[in-house]
């Protein structure tokens, strides 16, 4: 009776999920951040999965969703294909979505190098009408949803526990990064997008080969003796020279060269391979995971491309005399919407508290926002000219063009280092 796990299972109740540090942009999920970065740093590089639960007794939309880091999506989709019938809580079948978001503790855990997932809770009207209000009460408790989530994640926990190598598929990250790369902006800014495109394509193919090896090892080993596979030593995986391929991408351009990609991994090498995979996962989090001013998880080159697009459009609008259109674009850049509504002291405070503090205060937001541009003088100057009916925007155009050049330079450097 019961279940005897192969791995150590830890059950954590995190503190300070909603608030944990005063006067910081990143004041939530501080308990989870401190738990893994300060209290238990030894978890990093050894824990193979974090399963987070948010409102598991509430129906969110018409189906259950598991929101995951990109690297676990392949395994999760395969898991759903073999899922037995569960308590009928939703009219539609369960789906996987990615990436994870900053709104729950799994983000703090993931950037520490621990692959994470959560029952997706951001869908449905409840989040807009009841969540975090006096209208959020036990009347929304749904017994079937609660039971279904226990069944779903209980089976998932056992499926992960049965793996002998952490089932991370890095190809999806490389593919998504490639899809987000805009060749037009590479051409406009002089960034070497073709090099990055080649590297990402090669990394995608090689990561798929590596995952096939891991998948076969897990499928055939389960609780059996994996040492019976009798294949060549695989300890060289993910340790070859990276050349000019970049800190993360290069690990995949050569990591399966010289190995039989159809073969399983010998039992003696599974832990070594697992450590390598978790190390690469950490590198991917450090390299590819950035956030915009409002906590949305994005690729770094995607953030810069969007900012360049808005800047280019604002300059064009001003040259055409379309002031309102230019202001709408500036409103969308970083925190500059504050410049439309508040005095400069307020603007500077709410900019500084997200950028100019130590890591112990910025927590999981440390270094995640890139390329901020202060357009308070530009915005207030344009608003004043709008009141006066002035149509000479020469000064503001010059300031925006200078910002465009700074962003272009940052974009080139980012493309060169990915």
Predicted segments with their positions:
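Secretory-pathway/membrane protein signature
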Residues: 1-418
């Amino acid at each position: 009776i019961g279940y005897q796990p192969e791995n150590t299972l830890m059950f954590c109740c995190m503190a300070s999920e909603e608030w944990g540090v005063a006067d910081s942009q990143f004041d939530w999920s501080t308990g989870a951040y401190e738990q893994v970065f300060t209290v238990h740093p030894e978890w990093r590089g050894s824990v193979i999965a974090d399963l987070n639960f948010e409102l598991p007794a509430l129906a969110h939309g018409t189906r259950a969703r598991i929101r995951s880091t990109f690297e676990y999506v392949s395994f999760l989709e395969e898991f759903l294909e073999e899922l037995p019938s569960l308590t009928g809580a939703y009219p539609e079948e369960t789906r996987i979505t990615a990436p994870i978001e900053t709104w729950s503790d799994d983000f703090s855990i993931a950037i520490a190098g621990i692959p994470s997932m959560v029952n997706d809770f951001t869908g449905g009207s409840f989040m807009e009408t009841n969540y975090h209000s006096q209208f959020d009460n036990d009347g929304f408790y749904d017994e079937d949803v609660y039971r279904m989530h226990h069944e779903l994640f209980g089976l998932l926990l056992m499926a992960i526990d049965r793996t002998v190598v952490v089932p991370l598929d890095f190809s999806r990250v490389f593919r998504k990064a490639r899809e987000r790369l805009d060749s037009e902006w590479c051409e406009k800014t002089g960034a070497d997008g073709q090099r990055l495109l080649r590297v990402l394509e090669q990394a995608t193919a090689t990561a798929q080969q590596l995952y096939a090896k891991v998948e076969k090892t897990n499928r055939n080993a389960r609780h059996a003796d994996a040492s019976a596979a009798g294949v060549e030593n695989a300890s060289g995986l993910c340790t070859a020279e990276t050349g000019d391929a970049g800190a993360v991408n290069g690990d995949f351009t050569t990591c399966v060269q010289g190995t039989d990609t159809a073969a399983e991994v010998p039992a003696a090498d599974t832990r070594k391979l697992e450590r390598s995979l978790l190390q690469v996962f950490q590198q991917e989090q450090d390299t590819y995971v950035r956030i915009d001013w409002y906590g949305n998880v994005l690729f770094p080159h995607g953030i810069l491309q969007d900012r360049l697009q808005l800047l280019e459009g604002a300059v064009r609008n001003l040259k055409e005399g379309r002031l309102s259109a230019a202001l709408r674009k500036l409103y969308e850049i970083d925190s500059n919407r504050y410049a439309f509504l508040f005095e400069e002291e307020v603007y500077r405070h709410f900019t500084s508290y997200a950028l100019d503090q130590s890591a112990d205060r910025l927590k999981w937001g440390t270094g995640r926002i890139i390329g901020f541009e202060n357009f308070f003088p530009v915005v207030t100057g344009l608003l004043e000219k709008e009141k006066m009916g002035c149509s000479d925007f020469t000064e503001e155009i010059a300031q925006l063009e200078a910002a465009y050049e700074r962003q272009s330079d940052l974009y080139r450097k980012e493309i060169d280092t990915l």
